[in-house]
Amino acid sequence: MLVIFLGILGLLANQVLGLPIQAGGHLCSTDNPPQEELGYWCTYMESCKFCWECAHGICKNKVNESMPLIIENSYLTSCEVSRWYNQCTYGEGNGHYHVMDCSNPVPHNRPHQLRMKIYEKEDL
């Protein structure tokens, strides 16, 4: 009975967080999170390459329409994300990790915004 209750509680927690239901609520380390989770991951680490769609060196954010177009290599980082119980982790590919409680997320965008180059038509 307790196991069933805990299972239901875990499913409800994922729905509240906006995360899809997966085995145990876990997400193995990936650089390509499920499409339905992009809104969550890209809010708290918007410089991850998987958050952007790029063509001809110009990139548009897949989730946040208010983000400006950017030059491809100025801001984007190769990220891997994972979730284990209530710990969400961003691995930036350079040995830096950002770990947070999934239910109490903290943005980690500021260090990367300093390198962002916004696309201007004159850049062509």
From Swiss-Prot:
Residues that carry a glycan: 64
Induction: Expressed in the early phase of the viral replicative cycle.
Keywords (A to Z) from UniProt: Early protein, Glycoprotein, Signal, Virion
Family annotation (InterPro entries): ASFV_fam_110
Source superkingdom: Viruses
Compartment(s) where it occurs, according to its Swiss-Prot or TrEMBL record: Virion; Host endoplasmic reticulum-Golgi intermediate compartment
Nucleus found in the keyword field: no
Main location: virion
Motif (Prevents secretion from ER): 121-124
GO cellular component: host cell endoplasmic reticulum-Golgi intermediate compartment; virion component
Signal sequence segment: 1-28
Function field: Causes the redistribution of lumenal ER protein to an enlarged ERGIC compartment.
Entry similarity comment: Belongs to the asfivirus MGF 110 family.
The protein, known as: Protein MGF 110-4L
